[in-house]
């Protein structure tokens, strides 16, 4: 068994066991820290990675994303799942290619969403065809690639729960291994989604609700999206603004155990 197959099997086993948190590093350093802290798997963040390039979410290319995935895969022994946005193209072939390219980079999982960067949600039948193509690509690999299908309604200005559930059910029928609707805001919404499908559901962490709350509502996997990136960036900006405005260097006294984290 090679390294990638081992990671793939570990990732599948996580989804078959107790609910877990999959944090989202934005670069190799943050991936190493999260691994050292004790998390069992990692997922990329499209917004966090785009920030490292000085760009907004959605402005990284497939080539850049798979290179980033390869770097994270090499950085730790943890399984890596890749945020593949819409597959970097509107057609099913693009979704399939994104899965293949991420697998070639070392990833053992990836997500495909139903949002067109031009500003619309794909029609349901077309969105399901894209998931089916991604599923076919995943099943053609030599290891069990875990495909997550995302319904973007709730973060794209169309928070209609009934439509979101219909989409996730269609994606389940199309072969997705994990289902995900980022932007659900309440326990009742999460519970409704989880009860409507049989595959594991990923839930985006919600400030004010604990991991236990999300698991009680049915979540099997909890991710944090770009939030850890913004925690770090906000801390840097706050320290920099204190220096600019008051000549206050007090925030610079923080020390971190790099020898331990990067051992």
Feature roles, as predicted:
Residues 2, 11, 227-263:
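Extended, intrinsically disordered, low-complexity segments
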Residues 2-82, 87-224, 230-238:
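Alpha/beta enzyme core
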